[in-house]
């Protein structure tokens, strides 16, 4: 049986919010079977819990923000991407502020935290959402689509008319049966344009952004001394974001996601569209791990 997974131990980290610039304390805790991923604002009294579900997404400007009764938790996508990539079904995420810390701008530090905490299998079957037919949403020239696929695959293309990005691969196809999320995707950092950063700061956004957590690009070049981690780090980061956004379905996916210039808003619109079309998907479990189109590393090795 492919089993549900949680963490073995509690683990903590500290960082800053990308947009708020505030110091944030993050704690990841094991959670019982069928809990899902639940974010908790421990700085509030009483503590506010917000399940990481598509219907709880309230804002998608520059990051994915969960909202419940006016309480917000911003920038959840990189942590969710790490949880999805390692197949963690159940986890409590405690935060001391309204934003998940940005760490280095990728999902890498969260992968490290989860692996350091250890992964525990639970005595219940892991539930997958299997795509049964195509579902598409569009917004002008942006597009996001689910199609049936026996496994998990992400196809993504971006279209930036910028000398730095134009000269690199702007399209990628990643089949996770043969490609490691941890090695090939998790370390891709968020990127921003120098000309936009001033505007964002004027709006009280990107206050925690720096060369330590963003690939900064001016009109001609990458400003970070160490350059890029992957040749196609820009489009790979969009894949990382999409995997985090898709995990708001609450389960791992069996299917293919295709995105063209899609961002957090369109990704969420696609999830809501899929969930509303009950004949387009089904929940499946696997008694025999050998029959599953998706496999996960054994926890000892993960």
Swiss-Prot record:
Annotated Gene Ontology cellular components are:
membrane
Pathway membership: Glycolipid biosynthesis; lipid IV(A) biosynthesis; lipid IV(A) from (3R)-3-hydroxytetradecanoyl-[acyl-carrier-protein] and UDP-N-acetyl-alpha-D-glucosamine: step 2/6
UniProt xrefs under Gene3D superfamilies: lpxc deacetylase, domain 1, lpxc deacetylase, domain 2
Pfam families linked:
LpxC
InterPro entries in the record, alphabetically?
Ribosomal_Su5_D2-typ_SF (IPR020568), UDP-acyl_GlcNac_deAcase (IPR004463), UDP-acyl_GlcNac_deAcase_C (IPR011334), UDP-acyl_N-AcGlcN_deAcase_N (IPR015870)
GO MF terms on file? metal ion binding; UDP-3-O-acyl-N-acetylglucosamine deacetylase activity
Q: In the UniProt entry, which residues are flagged as the active site?
A: 264 (proton donor)
Binding of Zn(2+), residues: 78, 237, 241
Keyword list (alphabetical) reads: Hydrolase, Lipid A biosynthesis, Lipid biosynthesis, Lipid metabolism, Metal-binding, Zinc
* EC number, as in UniProt: 3.5.1.108
Q: Which reaction does it catalyse?
A: a UDP-3-O-[(3R)-3-hydroxyacyl]-N-acetyl-alpha-D-glucosamine + H2O = a UDP-3-O-[(3R)-3-hydroxyacyl]-alpha-D-glucosamine + acetate
Q: What does this protein need as cofactor?
A: Zn(2+)
Q: Does the keyword Transferase apply?
A: no
Q: Name one GO biological process term.
A: lipid A biosynthetic process
Its family remark reads: Belongs to the LpxC family.
Function (record text)? Catalyzes the hydrolysis of UDP-3-O-myristoyl-N-acetylglucosamine to form UDP-3-O-myristoylglucosamine and acetate, the committed step in lipid A biosynthesis.
* PANTHER family membership: UDP-3-O-ACYL-N-ACETYLGLUCOSAMINE DEACETYLASE 1, MITOCHONDRIAL-RELATED
NCBIfam families (UniProt xref)? lpxC
Q: What is this protein called?
A: UDP-3-O-acyl-N-acetylglucosamine deacetylase
> What organism is this sequence from?
Hahella chejuensis (strain KCTC 2396)
Query: Corresponding gene?
Result: lpxC
């Amino acid at each position: 049986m492919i089993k549900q997974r949680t963490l073995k131990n509690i683990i903590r980290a500290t960082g800053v919010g990308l947009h708020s610039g505030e110091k944030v304390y993050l704690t990841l805790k094991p959670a019982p079977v069928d809990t899902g991923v639940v974010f908790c604002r421990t700085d509030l009294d009483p503590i506010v819990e917000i399940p990481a579900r598509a219907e709880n997404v309230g804002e998608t400007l520059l990051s994915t923000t969960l909202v419940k009764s006016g309480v917000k938790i911003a920038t959840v996508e990189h942590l969710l991407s790490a949880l999805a990539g390692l197949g963690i079904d159940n986890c409590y995420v405690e935060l001391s502020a309204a934003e998940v810390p940005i760490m280095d701008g990728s999902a890498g530090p969260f992968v490290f935290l989860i692996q350091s905490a250890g992964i525990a299998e639970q005595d219940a079957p892991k539930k997958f959402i299997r795509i049964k037919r195509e579902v598409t949403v569009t917004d002008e020239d942006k597009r996001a689509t689910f199609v049936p696929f026996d496994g998990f695959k992400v196809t993504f293309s971006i279209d930036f008319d910028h000398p730095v990005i134009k000269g690199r691969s702007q399209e990628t196809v990643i089949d996770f049966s043969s490609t490691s999320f941890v090695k090939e995707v998790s370390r891709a950092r968020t990127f921003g344009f120098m000309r936009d950063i001033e505007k964002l700061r004027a709006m009280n956004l990107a206050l925690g952004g720096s060369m330590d957590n963003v690939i900064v690009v001016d009109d001609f070049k990458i400003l970070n001394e160490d350059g890029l981690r992957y040749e196609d780090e820009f489009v790979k980061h969009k894949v990382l974001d999409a995997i985090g956004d898709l995990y708001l379905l609450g389960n791992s996916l069996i299917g293919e996601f295709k995105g063209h210039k899609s961002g957090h808003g369109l990704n969420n619109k696609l999830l809501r569209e899929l969930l509303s079309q009950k004949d387009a998907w089904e929940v499946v479990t696997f008694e025999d791990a050998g029959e599953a189109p998706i496999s996960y590393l054994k926890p000892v090795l993960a």
